[in-house]
Regions:
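Conserved AMP-binding/adenylate-forming
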Residues: 1-3, 7-72, 78-81
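Conserved beta-strand termini and adjacent loop/short-helix elements that scaffold enzyme active sites
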Residues: 3, 28, 110-112, 159
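Conserved S/T- and glycine-rich ATP-binding loop of Class I adenylate-forming
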Residues: 5, 143, 168
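Residue-level detector of flexible, active-site-proximal loop/helix-junction positions
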Residues: 7-10, 88, 163
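Generic structural signal for residues in well-ordered beta-strands
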Residues: 25, 107-109, 156
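AMP-binding/adenylate-forming catalytic core of the ANL superfamily
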Residues: 36, 63-151, 161, 174
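Active-site donor-binding acidic/aromatic loop of nucleotide-activated sugar
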Residues: 54, 158-159
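Flexible lysine-rich "adenylation lid" loop at the C-terminal edge of ANL adenylation domains
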Residues: 153, 159-179
Length: 181
């Protein structure tokens, strides 16, 4: 079972994409917005912009979609999104596409500064044991088979392992700093 929630919602409020009774979910400009009985009234010392600015609602930093069935899908985080050529690419979706390539054991996608595009999509991959290192063209074609071409990496770096933060999540910022200069 996958739980979605945060301190502002008194913990989990959506389970396997289905909100609990009394919980409201909507998508506003791609962001997940939550409301209902479990929601905090606000912050003691509000930040700007205040995610509680709309009474009864909390604007998260998560990007999501609500399917026709009403199931919430969290697609990524606003701060991870890559703005390339005026379009938004969610690294988690590109990573999911790359992960289906048989030569990719692990991967991370991140944005680096680009004069023309704003940011360009870059991937770091760990090659599966016994596999031949895939080419950039091969990985781009693989991503384009599942996602729009703007999501395909414009460069790929092969690593022995991905850098991780203390909690085990991939450190995209470290990758962007390493390969963005």
């Amino acid at each position: 079972m996958r739980t979605y929630g945060m301190s502002e919602t008194a913990g989990g409020c959506v389970y396997d994409g289905v909100q609990l009774d009394g919980v409201l979910v909507r998508i506003d400009d791609g962001r997940v917005v939550l409301g209902g009985a479990t929601l905090a009234k606000g912050y003691r010392n509000p930040v700007e912009p205040d995610p509680f600015a709309e009474p009864g609602w909390f604007r998260t930093d998560d990007i999501g979609a609500v399917e026709d069935s009403g199931v919430l899908r969290v697609l990524g985080r606003v701060d991870d999104a890559i703005s390339t050529g005026g379009l938004t690419v969610l690294p988690q979706l590109v990573e999911a596409a790359l992960a289906t390539h048989p030569a990719v054991a692990d991967c991370a996608v991140f944005g680096v500064a680009d004069e023309r595009l704003g940011q360009r999509v870059v991937a770091a991959v760990v090659v599966a044991t016994g596999s031949t290192t895939p080419t950039l063209a091969e990985l781009r074609a693989h991503v384009v088979s599942a996602l729009p071409s703007t999501a395909a990496p414009r460069e790929v770096h092969v690593l022995d392992e991905l850098p991780r933060r203390g909690i085990g999540k991939v450190d995209r910022r470290a990758l962007a700093a390493r390969f963005g200069g």
